[in-house]
Structures are given as C-alpha cells and as structure tokens.
Amino acid sequence: MTTKLALSSTPEGIVPALLAHLNSLDVETMLGFYDPEGLIVDAAGVAHVGKEAIGKELAKYFSLGLQMSITQRHLFVAGDVASLILDWSYIGTARDGTKINMVATATDIARRGPDGLWRYLIDNPFGSMQRGAA
C-alpha cells in the first residue's frame, strides 16, 4: 500500500525522512523520496536511472522484509545540495528465513527542489566499498 510520507524542508531532516520512507517497505512510497533525475547505485557500482530502474533495485531490499538502521556520520550542505555519509544495516531474519547481516557505508547526494523539499539525487548505498581497479 503506497503511503505519502513527508519530505524534509531542512538538511538535518533528510535522514529521518529517508528512514521513514525506507522502512515503509513500499517501493512506490520510497520512489517519492527521489529527485526526478535521481539514480541508485548497486553493489557492483552500476547506476540505475529512472523511477522504474530505481524501483527494481529497491524491491530487492524490501523483499527481505527487514527494517533498516541508519547512523549519520556526516552531513555537508552547499546551497541546494547535501552530501551525506551514512552507516546503515539490515540485520535479522529475512522473510524466506535467511539470516541477514548486511552492513555498509553510503555516500549519498540530496538536492533541494523548487518546492523547498529535499530529495535523493544519488543513492549510493555501497559508496565506500572498493569495487575493483579504478
């Protein structure tokens, strides 16, 4: 069931809004958190652009049925752009009975829209993970 959750009007409110959207476990609800030009980067480093592609990636996480935990490490703001470094985890037993211990550090970018609300422009959940030769 799609729920319209509030977006943040301040940079400091981005993470609480993100967590509420993520833990809805609803792809359509979470898609409302993304900028129209947004993208998500998968664990292999591939960028998925557009609502349909982002939705497919989100569905993989939401299928676990777990609530995400997030600790904000850094928030830097320059005008209408915010850089976030977030430690996150999915820990528990997935819907299929699999034990999950997924922990990573995200490097994300949010942008304030013309309506004054912050949305994710770049969602890079495995941002600090080394992905091979540069």
PLM feature segments, named:
Residues 2-29, 39-134:
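A beta-strand edge to alpha-helix "cap/lid" segment located at domain peripheries
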Residues 36:
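Short glycine-dipeptide loop
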